[in-house]
Amino acid sequence: MNTFEKIYEQVKKIPYGKVATYGQIAAMAGNPRWSQIVGYALHVNPDPKNIKCYRVVNRFGELSDNFAFGGKSAQEQLLESEGITVEDGKVDLKIYGAFL
């Protein structure tokens, strides 16, 4: 399994209505220093219907300005459709964090 496949497998583990950070996904995929690689892998996500990359946020709970599948507003809409509250472009990780 290559690095991107490892990342995609971890993203698939984020439950409905929850989020994870790039760093958490990196650590779960095998290397906590892969945060930027996680971001790149999600940007080229080959299967966004099954690999829910919109559930990944930064360490502060902030949405991505460069969300590859419609921008920040699309990411916000997708998260809100799962019942996740987004305020000022941020998600409360204490409430919605999957792996805290």
Q: Where is each model-derived feature located?
A:
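Nucleic acid-binding interface residues in structured DNA/RNA-binding domains
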Residues: 1-100
